[in-house]
C-alpha cells in the first residue's frame, strides 16, 4: 500500500512540476492539470476504499465531477483561444482585454 501512495504522490508531483515548467502552451498546462486531478481522484478512491466508511464514498465522485467540468471548460477555452488568436501560447494572451 505505501508504494501505491508513493506512486500517486509522484504522479501528482510530476504533474505539478509539468504545470510549472511547461507554461508556454495552454494545451500542455491543461493536460498537466488533468493529471493532477486524476491522481488526486485515484488517491481519494484508494483511501476511501481502505477506510470502509460509507461517509467518505461520495468524495471521489465529487472530485471526478469537478475533473469533468474542468476538462470541459478547459477545452472550450482552448478552442476559443485558438480560434481567436490562432495559437495557444499563454504569453500572447492578455485576458484583461475586451
From Swiss-Prot:
GO cellular component, one term: mitochondrion
Pfam family, one: Oxidored_q2
Main location (coarse class): mitochondrion
Record InterPro entries: NADH_UbQ_OxRdtase_chain4L/K, NUOK/Mnh_C1-like
Keyword NAD: yes
The EC number(s) this enzyme carries: 7.1.1.2
Compartments it resides in: Mitochondrion inner membrane
Listed transmembrane segments: 2-22, 26-46, 58-79
Signal peptide: none
Keyword terms: Electron transport, Membrane, Mitochondrion, Mitochondrion inner membrane, NAD, Respiratory chain, Translocase, Transmembrane, Transmembrane helix, Transport, Ubiquinone
Assembly with partners or alone: Core subunit of respiratory chain NADH dehydrogenase (Complex I) which is composed of 45 different subunits.
Protein name, entry field: NADH-ubiquinone oxidoreductase chain 4L
